[in-house]
């Protein structure tokens, strides 16, 4: 009978063959899933996967990419967010200063409710 701490399924069961020919069970902590993008749910590149203890001891460059929203959003979603923020700020300024030029392919944002 395994010890009570091993009876839960929070540990992975790994079957090992010993040199004597017996098969024994080793209990290992499960590896967490890869970090996902907060917007689209895709797997984040350049972000380490591991338990909190492993992440705590890892160097900063392995934990997340060195860019805005690195480790939270994938590059495509971060690019979209930054562009949307810039566009929103432009139209906010345009409302305050109507003399700013508007290019023909630009459309004003939808009014917020």
UniProtKB/Swiss-Prot annotation:
Pfam families: Ribosomal_L34e. GO terms for cellular component: ribonucleoprotein complex; ribosome. Keywords: Ribonucleoprotein, Ribosomal protein. GO terms for molecular function: structural constituent of ribosome. One of its GO terms (biological process) is translation. Gene3D superfamilies: 6.20.340.10. Disulfide bonds: none annotated. InterPro entries: Ribosomal_eL34 (IPR008195), Ribosomal_eL34_C_sf (IPR038562), Ribosomal_eL34_CS (IPR018065), Ribosomal_L34e_arc-type (IPR047868). Belongs to the eukaryotic ribosomal protein eL34 family. This is Large ribosomal subunit protein eL34. It comes from Methanopyrus kandleri (strain AV19 / DSM 6324 / JCM 9639 / NBRC 100938). The gene is rpl34e.
């Amino acid at each position: 009978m395994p010890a009570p701490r091993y009876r839960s399924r929070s540990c992975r069961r790994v079957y090992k063959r010993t040199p004597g020919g017996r098969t024994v069970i080793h209990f290992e902590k499960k590896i967490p899933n890869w970090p996902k993008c907060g917007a689209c749910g895709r797997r984040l590149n350049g972000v380490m996967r591991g338990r909190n203890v492993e992440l705590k001891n890892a160097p900063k460059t392995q934990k997340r990419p060195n860019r805005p929203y690195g480790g939270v959003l994938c590059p495509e979603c971060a690019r979209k967010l930054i562009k949307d923020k810039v566009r929103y700020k432009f139209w906010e300024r345009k409302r305050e200063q109507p003399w700013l030029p508007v290019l023909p392919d630009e459309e004003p944002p939808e009014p917020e409710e």
